[in-house]
Protein backbone atom coordinates (compact mmCIF):
# COMPACT_ATOMS: atom_id res chain seq x y z
CA UNK A 1 0.00 0.00 0.00
CA UNK A 2 1.41 3.40 -1.00
CA UNK A 3 2.35 5.71 1.84
CA UNK A 4 1.72 9.46 1.94
CA UNK A 5 5.08 10.21 0.33
CA UNK A 6 4.31 7.96 -2.66
CA UNK A 7 1.20 9.73 -3.90
CA UNK A 8 1.25 10.52 -7.62
CA UNK A 9 1.55 14.19 -8.59
CA UNK A 10 -1.88 15.79 -8.79
CA UNK A 11 -0.94 18.33 -11.41
CA UNK A 12 1.02 17.86 -14.59
CA UNK A 13 0.83 19.19 -18.12
CA UNK A 14 0.19 15.89 -19.86
CA UNK A 15 -3.22 15.10 -21.35
CA UNK A 16 -5.78 14.08 -18.74
CA UNK A 17 -8.80 11.82 -18.90
CA UNK A 18 -12.13 12.98 -17.53
CA UNK A 19 -11.63 10.90 -14.39
CA UNK A 20 -8.13 12.29 -13.78
CA UNK A 21 -9.47 15.82 -14.16
CA UNK A 22 -12.09 15.08 -11.52
CA UNK A 23 -9.44 13.67 -9.16
CA UNK A 24 -7.40 16.89 -9.47
CA UNK A 25 -10.49 19.01 -8.87
CA UNK A 26 -11.54 17.11 -5.76
CA UNK A 27 -7.99 17.23 -4.38
CA UNK A 28 -7.83 21.02 -4.51
CA UNK A 29 -11.49 21.77 -3.77
CA UNK A 30 -10.96 20.32 -0.30
CA UNK A 31 -14.21 21.64 1.21
CA UNK A 32 -16.32 20.61 -1.79
CA UNK A 33 -17.98 24.01 -2.26
CA UNK A 34 -17.54 24.05 -6.05
CA UNK A 35 -14.69 26.57 -6.01
CA UNK A 36 -10.98 26.66 -5.38
CA UNK A 37 -10.37 29.66 -3.15
CA UNK A 38 -8.16 30.94 -0.33
CA UNK A 39 -5.58 28.40 0.82
CA UNK A 40 -6.87 25.85 -1.72
CA UNK A 41 -6.07 28.33 -4.49
CA UNK A 42 -2.58 28.98 -3.14
CA UNK A 43 -1.87 25.24 -3.01
CA UNK A 44 -3.21 24.79 -6.53
CA UNK A 45 -1.11 27.65 -7.84
CA UNK A 46 2.07 26.32 -6.17
CA UNK A 47 1.49 22.90 -7.76
CA UNK A 48 0.88 24.55 -11.13
CA UNK A 49 4.15 26.49 -10.85
CA UNK A 50 6.05 23.29 -9.99
CA UNK A 51 4.53 21.53 -12.99
CA UNK A 52 5.40 24.43 -15.29
CA UNK A 53 9.00 24.55 -14.09
CA UNK A 54 9.26 20.78 -14.45
CA UNK A 55 8.17 21.02 -18.07
CA UNK A 56 10.43 23.98 -18.84
CA UNK A 57 7.63 26.58 -18.87
CA UNK A 58 8.75 29.65 -16.94
CA UNK A 59 6.70 32.67 -15.88
CA UNK A 60 7.91 36.21 -16.59
CA UNK A 61 7.94 37.16 -12.91
CA UNK A 62 9.76 35.43 -10.03
CA UNK A 63 7.51 37.05 -7.42
CA UNK A 64 4.84 34.60 -6.16
CA UNK A 65 2.26 37.33 -5.52
CA UNK A 66 2.70 38.86 -8.96
CA UNK A 67 2.53 35.45 -10.63
CA UNK A 68 -0.69 34.63 -8.81
CA UNK A 69 -2.23 37.98 -9.76
CA UNK A 70 -1.25 37.44 -13.40
CA UNK A 71 -2.72 33.93 -13.27
CA UNK A 72 -6.03 35.14 -11.80
CA UNK A 73 -6.37 37.93 -14.37
CA UNK A 74 -6.05 35.33 -17.10
CA UNK A 75 -8.29 32.58 -15.76
CA UNK A 76 -10.71 34.07 -13.22
CA UNK A 77 -13.20 35.09 -15.90
CA UNK A 78 -15.82 36.57 -13.58
CA UNK A 79 -13.23 38.25 -11.28
CA UNK A 80 -14.65 36.81 -8.06
CA UNK A 81 -11.26 35.72 -6.70
CA UNK A 82 -12.19 32.04 -7.03
CA UNK A 83 -11.56 29.39 -9.68
CA UNK A 84 -14.60 27.38 -10.76
CA UNK A 85 -14.43 23.90 -12.21
CA UNK A 86 -15.15 25.14 -15.71
CA UNK A 87 -12.43 27.79 -15.41
CA UNK A 88 -10.04 25.05 -14.29
CA UNK A 89 -10.93 22.99 -17.36
CA UNK A 90 -9.38 25.73 -19.50
CA UNK A 91 -6.15 25.65 -17.47
CA UNK A 92 -5.60 21.90 -17.49
CA UNK A 93 -5.41 20.17 -20.87
CA UNK A 94 -7.78 17.21 -20.91
CA UNK A 95 -7.93 14.52 -23.54
CA UNK A 96 -11.67 14.83 -23.98
CA UNK A 97 -12.22 18.32 -22.58
CA UNK A 98 -15.92 17.64 -22.40
CA UNK A 99 -16.68 20.83 -20.47
CA UNK A 100 -15.30 22.98 -23.27
CA UNK A 101 -17.00 20.73 -25.80
CA UNK A 102 -20.27 21.31 -23.97
CA UNK A 103 -19.85 25.07 -23.96
CA UNK A 104 -18.99 25.15 -27.63
CA UNK A 105 -22.31 23.60 -28.55
CA UNK A 106 -24.56 25.03 -25.87
CA UNK A 107 -23.07 28.50 -25.76
CA UNK A 108 -25.98 30.65 -24.63
CA UNK A 109 -28.40 30.23 -21.77
CA UNK A 110 -31.32 30.11 -24.23
CA UNK A 111 -29.70 27.20 -26.11
CA UNK A 112 -28.99 25.52 -22.80
CA UNK A 113 -32.64 25.78 -21.77
CA UNK A 114 -33.75 24.37 -25.13
CA UNK A 115 -31.40 21.41 -24.61
CA UNK A 116 -32.74 21.01 -21.07
CA UNK A 117 -36.31 21.00 -22.39
CA UNK A 118 -35.41 18.27 -24.87
CA UNK A 119 -33.80 15.94 -22.36
CA UNK A 120 -35.94 16.54 -19.29
CA UNK A 121 -38.50 14.47 -21.17
CA UNK A 122 -40.67 13.68 -18.16
CA UNK A 123 -40.59 17.34 -17.01
CA UNK A 124 -39.46 16.23 -13.58
CA UNK A 125 -37.03 19.12 -13.12
CA UNK A 126 -34.13 16.69 -13.31
CA UNK A 127 -32.01 15.00 -15.92
CA UNK A 128 -31.36 11.45 -14.79
CA UNK A 129 -28.39 9.28 -15.78
CA UNK A 130 -30.07 7.80 -18.87
CA UNK A 131 -31.22 11.26 -20.06
CA UNK A 132 -27.78 12.76 -19.41
CA UNK A 133 -26.21 10.03 -21.53
CA UNK A 134 -28.35 11.03 -24.51
CA UNK A 135 -27.51 14.67 -23.89
CA UNK A 136 -23.74 13.97 -23.97
CA UNK A 137 -24.06 11.64 -26.95
CA UNK A 138 -25.68 14.44 -28.96
CA UNK A 139 -22.95 16.90 -27.99
CA UNK A 140 -20.19 14.51 -29.00
CA UNK A 141 -21.85 13.89 -32.36
CA UNK A 142 -22.11 17.64 -32.98
CA UNK A 143 -18.42 17.99 -32.17
CA UNK A 144 -17.54 15.09 -34.50
CA UNK A 145 -15.75 13.39 -31.62
CA UNK A 146 -15.58 9.60 -31.92
CA UNK A 147 -16.60 7.68 -28.81
CA UNK A 148 -17.63 4.18 -27.81
CA UNK A 149 -20.16 3.02 -25.24
CA UNK A 150 -17.64 2.62 -22.35
CA UNK A 151 -16.26 6.12 -23.02
CA UNK A 152 -19.77 7.63 -23.10
CA UNK A 153 -20.52 5.84 -19.83
CA UNK A 154 -17.34 7.32 -18.29
CA UNK A 155 -18.35 10.85 -19.39
CA UNK A 156 -21.82 10.37 -17.95
CA UNK A 157 -20.55 9.09 -14.61
CA UNK A 158 -17.87 11.79 -14.40
CA UNK A 159 -20.34 14.63 -14.95
CA UNK A 160 -22.72 13.08 -12.44
CA UNK A 161 -19.90 12.90 -9.89
CA UNK A 162 -18.88 16.48 -10.66
CA UNK A 163 -22.27 18.11 -10.49
CA UNK A 164 -24.60 15.78 -8.59
CA UNK A 165 -24.00 17.57 -5.29
CA UNK A 166 -26.43 15.52 -3.21
CA UNK A 167 -25.48 12.16 -4.78
CA UNK A 168 -28.99 11.10 -5.82
CA UNK A 169 -27.95 10.08 -9.36
CA UNK A 170 -29.74 12.95 -11.07
CA UNK A 171 -29.00 16.55 -11.94
CA UNK A 172 -31.30 19.47 -11.22
CA UNK A 173 -31.40 22.48 -13.52
CA UNK A 174 -29.25 24.63 -11.21
CA UNK A 175 -26.63 21.85 -11.00
CA UNK A 176 -26.53 21.37 -14.78
CA UNK A 177 -26.33 25.12 -15.35
CA UNK A 178 -22.86 25.09 -13.77
CA UNK A 179 -21.68 23.73 -17.12
CA UNK A 180 -22.55 27.10 -18.69
CA UNK A 181 -20.01 29.93 -18.94
CA UNK A 182 -20.43 32.16 -15.87
CA UNK A 183 -21.51 35.18 -17.91
CA UNK A 184 -24.23 33.07 -19.59
CA UNK A 185 -25.53 31.45 -16.43
CA UNK A 186 -28.64 33.53 -15.83
CA UNK A 187 -29.77 31.01 -13.21
CA UNK A 188 -27.03 32.31 -10.91
CA UNK A 189 -28.92 35.60 -10.83
CA UNK A 190 -31.87 33.84 -9.20
CA UNK A 191 -29.82 31.99 -6.56
CA UNK A 192 -30.60 34.50 -3.81
CA UNK A 193 -34.25 34.74 -4.83
CA UNK A 194 -35.36 31.11 -4.78
CA UNK A 195 -38.98 30.72 -3.72
CA UNK A 196 -40.73 28.14 -1.58
CA UNK A 197 -43.57 26.23 -3.25
CA UNK A 198 -46.11 28.40 -1.42
CA UNK A 199 -44.43 31.66 -2.51
CA UNK A 200 -44.15 30.43 -6.09
CA UNK A 201 -47.80 29.34 -6.26
CA UNK A 202 -48.92 32.73 -4.95
CA UNK A 203 -46.91 34.74 -7.49
CA UNK A 204 -47.81 32.43 -10.40
CA UNK A 205 -51.52 32.56 -9.55
CA UNK A 206 -51.32 36.37 -9.42
CA UNK A 207 -50.01 36.57 -13.01
CA UNK A 208 -52.07 33.67 -14.35
CA UNK A 209 -55.23 35.77 -14.06
CA UNK A 210 -57.48 33.44 -16.06
CA UNK A 211 -56.30 30.29 -14.27
CA UNK A 212 -55.18 28.64 -17.51
CA UNK A 213 -52.07 27.10 -15.91
CA UNK A 214 -49.64 29.07 -18.08
CA UNK A 215 -48.40 32.63 -18.59
CA UNK A 216 -47.19 34.37 -21.74
CA UNK A 217 -44.06 36.41 -22.47
CA UNK A 218 -45.48 39.74 -21.28
CA UNK A 219 -46.74 38.25 -18.03
CA UNK A 220 -43.31 36.67 -17.48
CA UNK A 221 -41.74 40.12 -17.97
CA UNK A 222 -43.94 41.56 -15.25
CA UNK A 223 -43.34 38.60 -12.95
CA UNK A 224 -39.52 38.87 -13.27
CA UNK A 225 -39.60 42.63 -12.66
CA UNK A 226 -41.78 42.08 -9.60
CA UNK A 227 -39.43 39.40 -8.28
CA UNK A 228 -36.40 41.66 -8.68
CA UNK A 229 -38.10 44.64 -7.03
CA UNK A 230 -39.22 42.55 -4.06
CA UNK A 231 -35.64 41.36 -3.58
CA UNK A 232 -34.31 44.93 -4.00
CA UNK A 233 -32.15 43.91 -6.96
CA UNK A 234 -31.54 45.96 -10.09
CA UNK A 235 -32.20 44.64 -13.58
CA UNK A 236 -31.81 46.58 -16.81
CA UNK A 237 -33.80 46.06 -20.02
CA UNK A 238 -31.01 44.05 -21.64
CA UNK A 239 -30.84 41.64 -18.69
CA UNK A 240 -34.61 41.31 -18.61
CA UNK A 241 -34.66 40.45 -22.33
CA UNK A 242 -31.93 37.83 -21.85
CA UNK A 243 -33.61 36.21 -18.83
CA UNK A 244 -37.02 36.22 -20.51
CA UNK A 245 -35.62 34.62 -23.68
CA UNK A 246 -33.85 31.94 -21.64
CA UNK A 247 -36.89 31.09 -19.52
CA UNK A 248 -39.24 31.16 -22.54
CA UNK A 249 -37.07 28.46 -24.15
CA UNK A 250 -38.95 26.12 -21.80
CA UNK A 251 -42.33 27.26 -23.16
CA UNK A 252 -44.57 25.44 -25.62
CA UNK A 253 -45.97 27.62 -28.41
CA UNK A 254 -45.46 30.75 -26.31
CA UNK A 255 -47.11 29.22 -23.25
CA UNK A 256 -44.96 28.93 -20.13
CA UNK A 257 -46.55 26.36 -17.86
CA UNK A 258 -46.45 26.44 -14.08
CA UNK A 259 -44.25 23.33 -13.82
CA UNK A 260 -41.60 24.71 -16.19
CA UNK A 261 -41.26 28.05 -14.41
CA UNK A 262 -41.24 26.29 -11.05
CA UNK A 263 -38.03 24.48 -12.10
CA UNK A 264 -36.29 27.85 -12.52
CA UNK A 265 -37.65 29.80 -9.57
CA UNK A 266 -38.20 27.25 -6.80
CA UNK A 267 -35.56 26.17 -4.31
CA UNK A 268 -36.55 22.56 -4.98
CA UNK A 269 -37.82 21.23 -8.35
CA UNK A 270 -41.43 20.01 -8.38
CA UNK A 271 -42.05 16.43 -7.29
UniProtKB/Swiss-Prot annotation:
- For binding Ca(2+) 1, which residues are annotated in this chain's numbering? 29, 31, 33, 35, 40
Q: Which residues form the EF-hand domain?
A: 16-51, 63-98, 107-142, 151-186, 195-230, 235-270
| Keyword tags | Calcium, Cell projection, Metal-binding, Phosphoprotein, Repeat, Synapse
Top-level division of the source organism's lineage = Eukaryota
Question: Which is a Gene Ontology cellular component entry for this protein?
Answer: cytosol
SMART domains in alphabetical order: EFh
Function (record text): Calcium-binding protein involved in calcium homeostasis and signal transduction. It plays a critical role in buffering intracellular calcium levels and modulating calcium-dependent signaling pathways. Predominantly expressed in specific neuronal populations, influences synaptic plasticity and neuronal excitability, contributing to learning and memory. During embryonic development, it facilitates neuronal differentiation and maturation.
Q: What is this protein called?
A: Calretinin
Species in which this protein is naturally found: Mus musculus
Gene name in the database record: Calb2
